[in-house]
Regions:
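Predominantly soluble domains enriched in secretory-pathway, periplasmic, or organellar proteins
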Residues: 1-284
Length: 284
């Protein structure tokens, strides 16, 4: 069996499953109607359900429910504060971010977040929350403690995702050609604009690079946002990807399947009915 840190949890198909890649056998599973976006942290896993707009809290080892909280409509993304005490939920249909007490589920704050917001990201300190505010064409920087608005950053199109790293904001936007634009706004200096092939999906910063997932591609960009370093063909449009050893796992938002790419570059189907996946232990 793989080490604990290499287990992943997958939601979708009205259930939550645990795998130990590259193995494809299900280690644990629980049926949860409408299982969607996940957030895993330490002893707990949070799973949003569109059945009743609820959030389930599960024991990460036994995969049994330990709490049930009221959430909101169309929960696209969930993040947990570094201390594990606050759960931030992006509710797209409500155009808002909901802050819950992660222990008892009590609502703390509700803040407006643009029009049809798509995703959000915390900075390294856990103090600043960036929201890709969707059709309002902007990125909102909020206090992760109070959801107070800190800064509003206009963008050149619909914003699909955002990432924060070392004070720099990275936003992935839909442009007029139905491809992607990466906007990089450093702490000091001029913003950078870079065009990328494919409709926008997700963005992350890893191993000193910016990785942008668009429909059909994974683009690697320099941290200054100025240079396209590499482009790989992939299946569909990645909503999240994880690396386990030499295996790249990619969750395709279009087919709701997870595909695995081995060290030799060959792709295969890992599992079906997947809306989200996370490492089982660690931050969501």
């Amino acid at each position: 069996m793989a080490a604990m840190g290499k287990r992943i949890i997958v939601s979708g198909g009205d259930e939550v499953r645990v795998f130990a890649p590259p193995g494809r056998g299900v280690l644990e599973h629980i049926r949860l109607e409408g299982a969607g976006t996940l957030c895993a942290c330490g002893e707990h896993v949070f799973c949003a359900s569109n059945w009743g707009d609820m959030v389930w809290r599960l024991d990460a080892q036994k995969l049994v429910p330990t709490g049930l909280f009221a959430g909101g409509p169309d929960m696209r993304n969930m993040l947990i504060s570094p201390d594990g005490e606050r759960l931030m939920i992006l509710c797209a249909e409500a155009d808002s971010v909901l802050l819950l007490d992660a222990v008892c589920g009590a609502p703390m704050v509700l803040a407006r977040a643009g029009v049809n917001p798509q995703h959000m990201s915390l900075d390294e300190s856990g103090e600043v929350l960036a929201v890709a505010a969707g059709e309002s064409g902007e990125v909102l920087l909020l206090s992760a403690q109070s959801l107070a608005l800190l800064r509003r950053l206009p963008m050149p199109g619909i914003v699909l995702d955002v990432a924060l790293r070392a004070g720099t904001v990275y936003a992935l936007c839909l442009n007029e050609t139905l491809n992607s634009t990466l906007v990089t706004i450093p702490r000091a200096g001029a913003r950078q604009i870079l065009s990328l092939s494919g409709m926008p999906g997700r963005i992350t910063c890893e191993r000193g690079d910016v990785i942008c997932a668009t429909e059909g591609f994974l683009h690697t960009v320099s941290m200054d946002g100025m240079r396209l370093l590499d482009t790989r063909r992939v299946s569909g449009r990645a909503s999240i990807w994880l690396t386990v050893g030499e295996t790249l796992l990619l969750c395709d938002a279009l087919s709701e399947c997870i595909f695995a790419r081995n060290g030799g570059g060959q792709w295969s189907l890992f599992c079906e009915h997947a809306r989200d996946m996370r490492f089982l232990f660690g931050k969501g």
